[in-house]
């Protein structure tokens, strides 16, 4: 017997080890990885919190369950107990083991579920904003109330669990007693039996349940700030004058009832317990009836007047929660009286007008610049750079490896050879080639660079498409980039990765379920495995409590590619704030910067005023750095994020209104303007563009994120909403309100104006014939002084599977003028009837030259061949013909 007991503990440990084997392996690998990226303390924050919490929680659970068990065992009804668990010490030992395991399990579940809320509670940071009903700081609702709710649910659940298990225990023991004593089971005596077995215990539990019902209604009182019963979000007239009153009464009555219940137990009287429970149920039902009567017989007929103060609460706090309370609002009186000097003063804005559009440019990148089939451009980013002394807006993209496209897709190819992407592509947004294609300033492999931007190490080990692990410094050279008939190879010289010792090879073989880690002869002791290479997943692994932007963007700095991810702090617990997309508070409080070669990742706080990020900073010490610690050249590329701007625009459509009466009437609702991508296509919401522009009353150009607003369900534009992002202006928002008594063309109305112009529509119809299709680019509406300039690039796509759109014309509109032009500059000249002497002089000189007709015919021939090659996707032939065409054109200059 002793030998069996001696074997029990090691056997139990072995069973636990087998059951949690995979978790143990993951745990060891996580420790190694977090140590590699220098965030091991962040990983241990959670573990340390869980362990510290588990100890007192375990003691509370263990003692409570044991005391409850003992109280049942000293019952007067010995008939059950003697035959039950109290017959010998074996029952006590069995219950002790059960209680020990159950208490550990419950303590772990509780601690792992609520450690974060407890740490948030302990590290609460004030918002310095009070709710208008209970005058509590918002931090109470965001950091403290969630923990109270969790504790309430857990304790109520445990108390109900005790009641249920008590009944189950009674029935089991009663049945066992009846069977062993060969007596019939009499259901009529159940009530008496339960009272004898656990009457006092159940009465105590009932008293505690009533006590926590009181606490639950106190929580309901605080939760009225999230009520959706009124015309606006938050506590309404009915909530404050009826529901709140009843909740307060219920809190007091249930508190008294719990005391009465406990005193009744001492005196051995159970009738008061039933009365207290009945009163509680009556009050809860009465509250619902009273609220219904107040809403329908008092509020409904006087709603606008009675609800106004509560609507104002909703407006004020929603605007604060979505950072709309600091918008600079200006009237924009459209006069359309620009002079030639105004055009000259805004030349930099006009020169940076974007005529390249996202989708066709990405298509072109993936046709012309992937170089090999296994490369891909995941998306295109837009940013601003000082190129050769000029402030330019550019498109740029990183050339990543698409490992799923590898052929053959072997283990060595996927994990040892094709380890990284190579290079970047950049073009200015304001210019195209003579064929209407992006005009590259950085392109090809190795990079051909016409800029002053240094790119000396363009390798991409960490990116948006790097979803698999790689092993570097093996006996096999890594593929670097293709060069003519051979390939350039590379040895990784970064510091990312975990050394592949035999133990680590074994760990990863188990973790990845791949024997190749052990069998491969190419892996050396100095080899390193690089995991978690996807930049967003890498950030989430370290800081899962942040919300990340859907569009990370690349920056070229210090000769390398870096990634920037906008990180948000969000909550749905901000009082009175209307929820949008399941949140009712958001701040872009951090920027995440990741090195594409070394994988170094840094979290920079960019909004020190945000209490949530300050709460995180107190909990996860060492995670965040100050914004000033980021390199200046990186900070210059911080953008106002489009995801944040999108949700702010959605909220602003309703909450630009500050007057409760107007808000109640719903008479001034806005929506983001619609747009049309094809001549005869469907409409969709306009995508907010990043624009280089000089804001009215400003002295220099800057990058601004701009959205256009219409009146709800109308196409008349009513406002321009912009977010600034250059230097000290970062984060400042401005709203230009347009005249409501004039028709101001929205992007969609602008398209209708184009379609109704007889000359332009005729030209579009000719292009949009069988074999080709006209596509609209990204609509830009540029404010210049007190006027609006409309720009619409036109793309022509030839038929054919691999054809790509080419930018052929630009439509410009100003006031009542509408022109179709080969370029922005020519369109501006046509609209404003201005003349450029240099251009005219050059044209005059060129017109005196005699051009050989045979050269023109040859040029036409090469052009036709190039177009045919493009349709067929034969980019080699296409390039050859374009080069020949270029030679002819150069010869006739």
UniProtKB/Swiss-Prot annotation:
The chain crosses the membrane at residues 9-29, 49-69, 94-114, 154-174, 202-222, 246-266, 273-293. Disulfide bonds: none annotated. Its main location: membrane. InterPro entries: UPF0182. Keywords: Cell membrane, Membrane, Transmembrane, Transmembrane helix. It is found in: Cell membrane. One of its GO terms (cellular component) is plasma membrane. This is UPF0182 protein CLJ_B0017. It comes from Clostridium botulinum (strain 657 / Type Ba4).
């Amino acid at each position: 017997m002793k030998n069996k007991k001696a074997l029990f503990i090691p056997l139990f440990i072995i069973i636990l080890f087998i059951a949690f084997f995979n978790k143990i392996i993951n745990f060891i690998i996580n420790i190694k990885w977090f140590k590699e990226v220098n965030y091991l303390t962040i990983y241990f924050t959670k573990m340390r919190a869980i362990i510290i919490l588990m100890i007192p929680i375990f003691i509370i659970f263990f003692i409570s369950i044991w005391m409850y068990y003992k109280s049942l065992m000293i019952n007067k009804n010995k008939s059950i107990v003697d035959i039950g668990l109290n017959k010998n010490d074996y029952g006590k030992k069995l219950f002790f083991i059960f209680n020990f395991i159950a208490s550990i399990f419950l303590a772990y579940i509780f601690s792992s579920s609520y450690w974060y809320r407890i740490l948030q509670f302990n590290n609460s940071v004030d918002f310095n904003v009070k709710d208008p009903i209970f005058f509590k700081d918002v931090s109470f609702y965001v950091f403290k109330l969630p923990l109270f709710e969790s504790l309430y649910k857990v304790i109520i659940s445990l108390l109900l669990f005790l009641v249920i298990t008590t009944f189950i225990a009674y029935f089991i023991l009663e049945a066992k007693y009846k069977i062993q004593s060969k007596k019939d089971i009499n259901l009529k005596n159940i009530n008496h039996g339960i009272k004898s077995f656990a009457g006092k215990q159940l009465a105590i539990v009932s008293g505690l349940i009533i006590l926590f019902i009181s606490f639950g209604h106190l929580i309901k009182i605080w939760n009225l700030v999230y009520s959706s019963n009124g015309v606006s979000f938050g506590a309404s007239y009915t909530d404050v004058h009826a529901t709140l009153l009843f909740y307060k009464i219920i809190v007091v009555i249930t508190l008294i009832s719990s005391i009465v219940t406990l005193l009744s137990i001492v005196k051995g009287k159970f009738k008061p317990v039933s009365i207290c429970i009945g009163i509680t149920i009556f009050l809860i039902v009465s509250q619902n009836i009273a609220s219904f009567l107040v809403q329908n017989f008092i509020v409904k007929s006087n709603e606008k007047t009675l609800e106004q103060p509560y609507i104002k609460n909703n407006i004020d706090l929603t605007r604060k929660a979505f950072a709309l309370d600091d918008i600079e609002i200006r009237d924009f009186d459209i006069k359309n009286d620009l002079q030639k000097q105004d055009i000259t003063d805004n030349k930099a804005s006009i020169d940076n007008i974007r005529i390249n559009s996202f989708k066709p440019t990405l298509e072109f990148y993936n046709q012309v610049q992937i170089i090999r089939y296994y490369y891909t451009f995941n998306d295109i980013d837009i940013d601003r750079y000082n190129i050769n002394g000029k402030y330019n807006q550019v498109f740029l993209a990183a050339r990543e490896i698409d490992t799923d496209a590898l052929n053959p897709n072997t283990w060595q190819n996927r994990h040892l050879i094709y380890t990284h992407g190579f290079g970047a592509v950049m073009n200015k947004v304001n210019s195209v080639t003579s064929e209407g294609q992006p005009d590259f300033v950085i392109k090809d492999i190795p990079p051909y660079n016409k800029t002053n931007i240094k790119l000396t190490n363009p390798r991409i080990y960490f990116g948006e498409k790097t979803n698999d692990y790689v092993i570097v410094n093996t006996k096999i050279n890594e593929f670097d980039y293709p060069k003519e008939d051979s390939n350039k190879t590379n040895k990784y010289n970064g510091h990312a990765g975990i050394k592949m010792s035999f133990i680590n090879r074994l760990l990863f073989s188990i973790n990845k379920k791949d024997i190749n880690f052990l069998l491969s002869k190419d892996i050396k002791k100095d080899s390193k495995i690089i995991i978690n290479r996807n930049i967003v997943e890498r950030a989430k692994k370290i800081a899962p409590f942040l919300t990340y932007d859907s569009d990370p963007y690349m920056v070229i700095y210090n000769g390398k590619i870096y990634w920037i991810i906008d990180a948000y702090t969000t909550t749905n617990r901000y009082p009175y704030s209307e929820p949008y997309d399941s949140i009712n508070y958001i701040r872009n409080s951090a920027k995440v910067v990741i090195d594409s070669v070394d994988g170094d990742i840094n979290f920079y706080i960019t909004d020190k005023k945000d209490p949530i990020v300050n709460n995180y900073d107190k909990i996860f010490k060492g995670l965040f750095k100050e914004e000033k610690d980021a390199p200046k050249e990186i900070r210059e590329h911080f953008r106002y994020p489009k995801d944040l701007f999108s949700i702010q625009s959605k909220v602003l459509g309703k909450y630009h209104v500050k007057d409760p009466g107007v808000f109640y009437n719903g008479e001034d609702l806005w929506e983001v303007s619609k747009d049309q991508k094809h001549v005869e296509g469907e409409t969709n919401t306009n995508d907010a563009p990043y624009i280089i522009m000089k804001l009215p009353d400003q002295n220099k150009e800057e990058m601004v994120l701009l959205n256009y607003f219409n009146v709800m369900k109308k196409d008349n534009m009513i406002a321009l909403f912009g977010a600034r992002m250059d230097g000290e202006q970062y984060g400042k928002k401005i709203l230009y309100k347009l005249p409501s008594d004039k028709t101001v063309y929205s992007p969609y109305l602008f398209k209708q104006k184009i379609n109704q112009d007889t000359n332009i529509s005729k030209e579009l119809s000719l292009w949009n014939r069988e074999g080709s299709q006209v596509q609209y680019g990204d609509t830009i509406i540029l404010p210049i002084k007190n006027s609006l300039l409309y720009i619409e690039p036109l793309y022509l796509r030839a038929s054919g599977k691999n054809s790509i759109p080419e930018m052929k014309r630009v439509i410009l509109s100003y006031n009542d003028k509408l022109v179709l032009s080969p370029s922005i500059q020519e369109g501006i000249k046509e609209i404003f009837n201005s003349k450029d002497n240099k251009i005219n002089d050059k044209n005059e000189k060129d017109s005196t030259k005699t051009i050989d007709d045979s050269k023109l015919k040859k040029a036409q021939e090469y052009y036709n061949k190039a177009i045919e090659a493009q349709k067929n996707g034969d980019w080699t032939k296409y390039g050859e013909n374009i080069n020949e065409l270029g030679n002819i054109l150069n010869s006739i200059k």
